[in-house]
Amino acid sequence: APLPVYQFLMKLWRLREGMILLLPAPLYHSAPHAALNFTIRVGGTTVIMERFDPELYLSLIEKHRITDSQMVPTMFSRMLKLPEEVRNAYDVSSLEVVVHGAAPCPVQVKQQMIEWWGPVILEYYGATEAQGLTFCHSEEWLTHPGTVGQVKFGEMHILDDDMQPCAVGTSGTVWFVNASEFEYFNDAERTAEAYSPDRTMSTVGDMGYVDEEGYLYLTDRA
């Protein structure tokens, strides 16, 4: 039977039979590797790039009628630096879902990408440690520019250095109530630092704040 987390991600990332996924990132990273496995599981097709090249990426979208992709913000920036005539030379209308994460995306960059590709861009925030996940559709982002979304998996808290809750709009460390246990290989000290004193919460050290609607905005990543 499908695992609960798999079922959750399948719905959130709109994984579906017949999807054609383009992966421009190395498979030794957890996110693209997971995307590859999920796509195979639902009966989709995956096109894997040996390395990211912005114009080649666009040409592959047109050639294979790519419906889905998983990217990082630097890839957006590199594509936007292409001459306008090059960007417009390729048909990207087949795109339905483009998921990005791994690093903060500058507001101007994401705004330009949504203007170019339409509201197909989805953003997530999480870590390999799998404590929790936030998610944001293009439509949500346009009304909350700069957000990485609301919590969809886990329970999040923004705490100050004294482990006290931060007020709305005040930046602090992003903590998640433990959804899973993890430890760093041969690094007991770092593992201990990642947990709260009572070990009910964990963090990777990222900083951020939430607005009144619970949307998370990152201010610094570890």
Where would I find each of the regions flagged by the language model?
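Active-site phosphate/pyrophosphate- and oxyanion-stabilizing loops and adjacent acidic/basic residues
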Residues: 7, 77, 111, 146, ...
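Short, P/G- and charge-enriched loop/turn segments at secondary-structure junctions
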Residues: 9-10, 140-147, 194-196
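A structural signal for the hydrophobic beta-strands that form the central parallel beta-sheet
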Residues: 23, 48, 71, 100, ...
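Gly/Ser/Thr-rich phosphate-binding loop
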Residues: 41-42, 63-71, 80-144, 152-157, ...
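Alpha-helix capping/helix-boundary segments
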Residues: 53, 75-76, 105
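Short coil-to-beta-strand transition motifs
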Residues: 148-153, 202
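Conserved ATP-binding/catalytic segment of the ANL
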Residues: 167-169, 175-222
